[in-house]
């Protein structure tokens, strides 16, 4: 499952601009590891891994909104 900047904004409680910055940074990390990325989206699994978030809680949060 991929999340967009608006989702990142809500999950991390940051501004929209910061949400885009987070996505760009994480996508760059994934590209350096050899993964293909989608501009403006980030896999929820990687977001949770990097920010030490509980993946199930984040998915539940997104499903409620």
Please identify what each model-predicted range represents:
Residues 2, 10-11:
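Charge-rich amphipathic alpha-helical interaction elements
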Residues 5-6, 45:
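Residues within the helices of the helix-turn-helix
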């Amino acid at each position: 499952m991929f999340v967009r900047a608006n989702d990142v904004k809500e999950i991390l409680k940051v501004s929209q601009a910061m949400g885009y910055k987070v996505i760009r940074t994480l996508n760059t990390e994934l590209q350096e590891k050899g993964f293909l990325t989608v501009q403006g989206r980030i896999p929820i699994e990687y977001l949770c891994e990097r920010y030490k978030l509980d993946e199930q809680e984040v998915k539940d949060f997104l499903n409620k909104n």
